Amino acid sequence: MSTIQIRRSDDSDVVSAANDYHSNMAIQEITVAELHEILPNIVLVDVRETDEYVSGHVPGAVSIPLSTVQDNIEPFLAHKPTYVICLGGARSYRACEFAEQNGAECINIAGGTGAWIQSGFDVVLGELPNS
């Protein structure tokens, strides 16, 4: 009877592979100060919900709530790169991950609209999405 030897990787191999995968999938980010410098010459998508968008958004931002990104991927694909913002950076990061998995090139805005407002930059109030 023959025996089969199974080699088990130690945990460091698994952690290293996971880190390599994550670093290859990392989403690019810029600060709100960097965003301020390049506006209005970019496409900026705000993935907050409509009521959040209407309560104050970065001038020129287009509203595509995160809950609808899957059905509205075209704007992400039409412009390379597409800049994506939310309130703090987490939802926009998720939107970027989804869009990039579908062929888009996205840049997340670190700190989001909250950091934009804290920096004292102008916001647009009360405007309907995409108007």
Task: Kindly give the residue locations of the regions a language model identified.
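Rhodanese-like catalytic fold shared by cysteine-dependent sulfurtransferases
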Residues: 2-43, 49-81, 91-131
